[in-house]
Swiss-Prot record:
Family statement drawn from the similarity comment of this UniProt entry: Belongs to the WD repeat DCAF12 family.
Location of this chain's protein in the cell: Cytoplasm; Cytoplasm, Cytoskeleton, Microtubule organizing center, Centrosome; Nucleus
InterPro entries cross-referenced by the UniProt entry: Beta-prop_DCAF12 (IPR056151), DCAF12 (IPR051191), WD40/YVTN_repeat-like_dom_sf (IPR015943), WD40_repeat_CS (IPR019775), WD40_repeat_dom_sf (IPR036322), WD40_rpt (IPR001680)
Keyword match Membrane: no
The encoding gene: dcaf12
Coiled-coil annotated residue ranges, if any: none
Organism for this UniProt entry: Danio rerio (Zebrafish)
Keyword list, A-Z: Cytoplasm, Cytoskeleton, Nucleus, Repeat, Ubl conjugation pathway, WD repeat
Name this polypeptide is given: DDB1- and CUL4-associated factor 12
Each WD repeat, start to end: 167-207, 211-249, 279-318, 367-404
Subunit structure: Component of the DCX(DCAF12) E3 ubiquitin ligase complex, at least composed of cul4 (cul4a or cul4b), ddb1, dcaf12 and rbx1.
Keyword match Iron-sulfur: no
Length: 482
């Protein structure tokens, strides 16, 4: 009887199964989750077999909560695009936003063609410019920077070194945050160089200024301290931001009161294969990292996809010819689906490196000729930004684009002839300069190419930015869809 009594008491003490309501936010943590985790940790901290078994009883409930939240996120991901509404931001006279990333729930950092790095507050619309990091003086001098053990540090204060003249038509093409969101990598004052800032303060950390001979087009973090840059010169540079680099930059700021940064050398520099095509067309245009397999995907403008093993070094694994090889300028990796999405002139191709190239699936963007300018994964939805200022949403699970609403309130949401959902960017700003007056003044309006877009952590806000597709036109667009 005693055993039965104890059993009944234990059973009575077991936490009741949590009830969920569909009206709960998909992204709000259930109230009892923290108490469940606390109880599980308490039981697991007791060093006995009974307590260990008792702690395991909480795991199925946690798995149920996780599965439910994941299902709800997936459900919301397929519904939210149809109800998004646009709010434009004024960026002044900046020219074409090429890159963007969310810093937190209200700030987005952006880079432009005119080599400007700035942060926009999506609540107030305020723009804050970030100083660009310059190369060391006399780059022709022999200097190892922080490339090897025991090599000297080289420091500069922002503005203390005369930077290179801004090269026409280049700018900042990439902005990436490391996995812990403590460092930000982007282009430097010299677009051939890699600049690293500390988050959340955006204090300068270092500049990698001896790797590439041409513009940096793409950046990917392969760990918290190592980043890879892809350049128009056909090379990929591996950079390490070590604890020494971080501590020395912080120490200098504490001593002098002015943020300073060091200059580092690449850890490795690899050229992509050039035996397949014309060597002058082997420009690394986009990178995407698969953390599960420690593999780095790269797309070159000659129409090839390259896969590299990326850990402490870069080693090539394979190269594959893409089915659509014109204007391959964007790349994203879908972790849940183990595929890379590659944008081209009129298609998005889905590539699994472990399958034959004959199994590459491609879908048409319905806007031939304008090009796919940006692509991203969120849950099972692939968001596609086009050169005609459109946002399309492809359901990789159902293998079709999301359907558009039958009625379209507002002027920026419409249903295409095929019945798919398409969001169209606003007017933005266009400079009526001499180029516009000479060649384009008879055209009433220009669509703003979606060069960059990014979701916030909740998946309910989509930041979209870009500018006119024509290279000779000067203008910008930025908006928050929520």
């Amino acid at each position: 009887m005693a055993r039965k009594t104890v059993s009944r008491k234990r059973k009575a003490e077991e936490p009741k199964e949590q009830q969920f309501d569909w009206c709960q936010s998909a992204f709000k943590r259930p109230r009892v989750s923290s108490s469940v985790r606390h109880a599980q940790h308490w039981w697991q901290s007791r060093r006995s077999v009974v307590c260990s078994v008792r702690g395991r009883e909480f795991r199925p409930q946690q798995q149920h909560e996780w599965s439910f939240q994941r299902s709800l996120r997936g459900f919301a991901a397929g519904r939210i695009p149809g109800i998004l509404r646009e709010r434009e931001f004024s960026l002044g006279r900046l020219n074409k936003v090429f890159a963007s990333q969310w810093l937190n729930h209200r700030q987005v950092v952006c880079g432009t063609k005119c080599n400007t790095l700035f942060v926009v507050d999506v609540l107030s619309g305020q723009i804050t410019r970030i100083p660009m990091l310059k190369d060391r003086e006399g780059r022709g001098e022999v200097s190892q920077g922080l490339g090897g053990v025991g090599s000297p540090f080289h420091f500069h204060n922002p503005g203390s070194v005369g930077g290179l003249d801004v090269q026409q038509g280049c700018g900042i093409h990439a902005i990436e945050l490391n996995p812990s969101r403590t460092l930000l990598a982007t282009g430097g004052d010299n677009p051939n160089s890699l600049a690293v800032y500390r988050l959340p303060t955006l204090d300068p950390v270092c500049v990698g200024d001896d790797g590439h001979n041409d513009w940096i087009f793409s950046i990917a973090w392969i760990s918290d301290t190592m980043a890879v840059s892809g350049s128009r010169d056909g090379s990929m540079g591996l950079w390490e931001i070590s604890e020494d680099v971080l501590s020395q930059a912080e120490k200098r700021q504490n001593v002098e009161g002015v943020p300073g940064y060091s200059h580092i050398s690449h850890r490795a520099l690899k050229d992509i294969p050039k035996e397949y095509t014309h060597p002058y067309n082997c420009k690394v245009r986009a990178l995407a990292f698969n953390n599960s397999h420690k593999e780095l995907g790269a797309v070159s403008l000659d129409g090839y996809f390259h896969l590299w093993k990326a850990e402490d070094n870069l080693s090539k694994e394979l190269s594959t010819k893409l089915p659509y090889c014109k204007e391959n300028v964007c790349l994203a990796y879908g972790l849940d689906w183990s595929v890379y999405a590659v944008g081209s002139q009129a298609h998005v191709s889905f590539l699994d490196p472990r399958q034959s190239s004959q199994n590459i699936k491609s879908v048409s963007s319905r806007e031939r000729g304008s090009g796919i300018r940006s692509v991203s994964f969120y849950e099972h939805i692939v968001t596609v930004g086009t050169g005609q200022g459109s946002l399309l949403f492809y359901d990789i699970r159902a293998q079709r684009f999301l359907d558009g609403p039958s009625s379209t309130p507002g002027g920026y949401r419409n249903r295409t002839a095929e019945g798919i959902l398409k969001l169209t960017t606003g007017r933005g700003w266009l400079n009526h300069d001499e180029t516009w007056r000479s060649y384009f003044s008879d055209i009433r309006s220009f669509p703003n190419a979606v060069y960059t877009h990014c979701y916030d952590d909740s998946g309910t806000k989509l930041f979209v930015a870009g500018g006119p597709l024509c290279s000779g036109l000067h203008g910008n667009y930025a908006g928050l869809w929520s």
